[in-house]
């Protein structure tokens, strides 16, 4: 059953330090909006994030598409913006290998994701070792709390992530209550009867477009929030097709928060 508890109530009882921090921040900013900023240059990334920062609780990156990436010029300014605007950082890496490999992918290489991303995500296809590997990597890299989202369902047409696959992914999530904070999913994932209170983040949310020619399918803000989504992930709806990110940031922030208030009120 979809929870009607407020983010503040849930932050008080969560075993995940990242969830607690995120829910507290969401209440403080009155925002459940995550900006997906898929651009190709550091300048574009930082400019967009600075404009959207006041309206979001999270920024979602695909850091490996930045053509001119460097830790000093890309990540350090991004971290400064996260402090300035009070948002968290989610690197959408979608890890999908054995535990030892993902540990090195998470901590090493050019990107050193574990050093700067508050949360990341992983597929369940390789089993629970992916969770163990990423958790070890986080613990060995930083004293800062880190969180993991499992990819239970996707928003793209023809996705294989549903049914039995989703159920198995939920089983993997249950192996670590502190590090695994929730799911990328299209619906409520259950677990409350076993003491889990997972954060559900949903991509493919739009107020205008219904999809694109590459298989993306959009659902409305009210629809996803009513079905259990806690954080709406919006990308091109904020800045694509010449849209003004400030105008759209305000618009999506308001729509997401109002939908959340409706859900909470329904349970009172």
From Swiss-Prot:
Query: Any idea of its EC number?
Result: 4.1.1.23
- Identify the gene encoding this protein: URA3
Active site located where? 94 (proton donor)
| Cross-referenced Pfam families | OMPdecase
InterPro entries assigned to the protein according to its UniProt record, in alphabetical order:
Aldolase_TIM, OMPdecase, OMPdecase_AS, OMPdeCOase_dom, RibuloseP-bd_barrel
Keywords attached to this entry: Decarboxylase, Lyase, Pyrimidine biosynthesis
For the protein in the UniProt heading, the enzyme class is lyase
Return the similarity comment: Belongs to the OMP decarboxylase family.
Q: What is this protein called?
A: Orotidine 5'-phosphate decarboxylase
SMART domains xrefs: OMPdecase (SM00934)
A GO CC annotation given for this chain = cytosol
Q: Where does substrate bind?
A: 38, 60-62, 92-101, 218, 236
Pathway membership, UniProt: Pyrimidine metabolism; UMP biosynthesis via de novo pathway; UMP from orotate: step 2/2
* An annotated Gene Ontology molecular function: orotidine-5'-phosphate decarboxylase activity
- Catalytic activity annotation: orotidine 5'-phosphate + H(+) = UMP + CO2
GO biological process terms on file: 'de novo' pyrimidine nucleobase biosynthetic process; 'de novo' UMP biosynthetic process
């Amino acid at each position: 059953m979809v929870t009607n508890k407020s983010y503040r109530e849930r932050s008080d009882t969560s075993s995940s330090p990242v969830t607690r921090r995120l829910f507290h921040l969401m209440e403080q900013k009155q925002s459940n909006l995550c900006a997906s900023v898929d651009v190709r240059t550091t300048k574009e990334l930082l400019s967009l994030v600075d404009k959207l920062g006041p309206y979001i609780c999270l920024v979602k990156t695909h850091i490996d598409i930045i053509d001119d990436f460097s830790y000093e010029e890309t990540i350090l300014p991004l971290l400064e913006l996260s402090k300035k605007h009070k948002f968290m950082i989610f690197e959408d890496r979608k890890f999908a290998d054995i535990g030892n490999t993902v540990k090195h992918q998470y901590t090493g290489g050019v990107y050193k994701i574990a050093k700067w991303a508050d949360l990341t995500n992983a597929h369940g296809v390789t089993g629970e070792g992916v969770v163990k590997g990423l958790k070890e990597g986080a613990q060995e890299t930083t004293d800062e709390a880190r969180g993991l989202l499992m990819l239970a369902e996707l928003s793209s047409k023809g996705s294989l992530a549903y049914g039995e696959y989703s159920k198995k992914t939920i089983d993997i999530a249950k192996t670590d209550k502190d590090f695994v904070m929730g799911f990328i999913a299209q619906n409520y994932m259950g677990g409350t009867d076993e003491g889990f209170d997972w954060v559900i983040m949903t991509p493919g949310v739009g107020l205008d477009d219904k999809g694109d020619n590459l298989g993306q399918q959009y659902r409305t803000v009210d629809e996803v929030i009513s079905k259990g989504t806690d954080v709406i992930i919006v990308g091109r709806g904020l800045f694509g097709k010449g849209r003004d990110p400030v105008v759209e940031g305000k618009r999506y922030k308001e729509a997401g928060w109002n939908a959340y208030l409706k859900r909470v009120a329904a349970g009172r």
